[in-house]
Amino acid sequence: GTTGQRCTSTRRVIVHESIFERVADAMVDAYGKLRAGHPFEQGVHYGPLVYESVCDDYQAAVQRAVDEGGRLLCGGGRLPELGPCYVAPAIVAATADMPCTQEELFGPLVYLIPYKGSIEDAIALQNGVRQGLASAIFTEDLREVETFVSAVGSDCGIANVNLGTAGAEIGAAFGGEKESGFGRELGPEGWKTYMRRQTVTVNYSGKVAMPQGVQFKL
């Protein structure tokens, strides 16, 4: 993987309170099986962070989450035996009102956030940040799917269903909303970003054409 350094990496996992602990246990178990090392080695799941300063930022972010009331479920430290830029991915049980969950971090830190109520409540939590690049929902409920991808659903440029936020390399239009930018790469919208579009109307009739067929008798 990209060790959380991809722009579409998952930062928040919003889970209904009724299954929160079950999901937390499953995630911690999965994280415990991840193997760090050289990305070209067989069986390695993730490599180092790009700079030592990024490692410092990562550890500071984990500590900030704990200071704000988060519960560190796993990870968060360095792995010096592998090199200066290796860290253990962290999961923090958090709440949506913690300021740290509003910030973007390029590192392997995931906030696990519970919600009460309906899918609309979960979407409100998801949309309640300044960033808006990628989002995803995992559900077998068609109504939840339709709500998530509708005008009242995810406000991100990318909305995936039963697929992670990193999505799939399918050549579709790629881009975000809010502080995550504007415009699109790839797909039919991609080349339009590099153009200056102009609407041109040429009238060869010899008569003046007015909008909506309006005529003035002078």
Regions found by a protein language model. Name each.
Residues 35, 67, 79, 86-218:
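Conserved C-terminal structural/oligomerization subdomain of aldehyde/semialdehyde dehydrogenase
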Residues 1-96, 120, 124, 161, ...:
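ALDH superfamily catalytic-core signature
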